[in-house]
Amino acid sequence: MASHVIEIARQEGAEFRSVRLTLEDDGTIKMDAQDIGPTVTRIWGDDDYEFGVSVPAASLPQLAFELLREKFLGQLGAVDAFREWCTTHGVQHEFDSWI
């Protein structure tokens, strides 16, 4: 059973899509989607199509590094912005400064 699941995007209507983000009990991060609608039926011959990407816990440091690099690249205020982001999202962190 997944320890935490949230829906991060949803499109209602004839061409339905739901995108979920899951943190599994073993630390795996998974992003998956479900499509329902006439396009799915036409292409796959079924009423729904599900697909996703899983990143094992052992790869999370690399994932975090690359996401942070992409988010903050070129920003001179990156340290302050990162500290604020961690605080806002309840991510345990430590701020340090020295002279």
Description of each model-found segment:
Residues 1-29:
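Short, charged/polar N-terminal "headpieces" of proteins
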Residues 20-57:
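A short, structured beta-strand/loop element
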Residues 42-99:
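Mixed-charge, Lys/Arg-enriched low-complexity segments
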